Each structure stands twice: as C-alpha cells, then as structure tokens.
Amino acid sequence: MARYRHNRSRSRSRHRRRRRGHRGGRYRRRRRRGRYGHRRHHRGHSRRRRKRRRSRH
C-alpha cells in the first residue's frame, strides 16, 4: 500500500479506502482537469529527454 504511506500513523480500521469509479458527488470541483487528470507525474511523452536516433539509410 504505497499509496497511503503518509497515513501510517492512523489506525487501519479507521482509514477508509476510496471507492474507485465514483466520480463527482457532493463536492465536485468545477475546474476542468488538465491533460492527465489527477495524476501528478505522467511518464509518457516527454519531449525533453529524448535522444534523437540516427536514422540508417
């Protein structure tokens, strides 16, 4: 349970897991999410760190 590492001090029975697939609800945020939603780090297409491959002719 690496996701909840910061909640270690709490007792386990008290910690409720988030339900997956439940969107919105009472306190839905109005702001639209960015490109990748709620994920902090997206390791996909980063333009910066790619070396250019030499094409073989």
Swiss-Prot record:
Gene Ontology MF terms: DNA binding
Q: Which domain of life is it from?
A: Eukaryota
Q: Where in the cell is it found?
A: Nucleus; Chromosome
Segments carrying the region annotation (Disordered) are 1-57
- List the keywords (alphabetical): Chromosome, Developmental protein, Differentiation, DNA condensation, DNA-binding, Nucleosome core, Nucleus, Spermatogenesis
* One GO cellular component term noted in the UniProt record for this chain: nucleosome
Q: What is its main location?
A: nucleus
From its record, what is one biological process in GO terms?
chromosome condensation
Q: In which tissues is it expressed?
A: Testis.
Q: Which family does it belong to?
A: Belongs to the protamine P1 family.
| Summary of the function given for this chain in its UniProt record | Protamines substitute for histones in the chromatin of sperm during the haploid phase of spermatogenesis. They compact sperm DNA into a highly condensed, stable and inactive complex.
Q: What is this protein called?
A: Sperm protamine P1-type
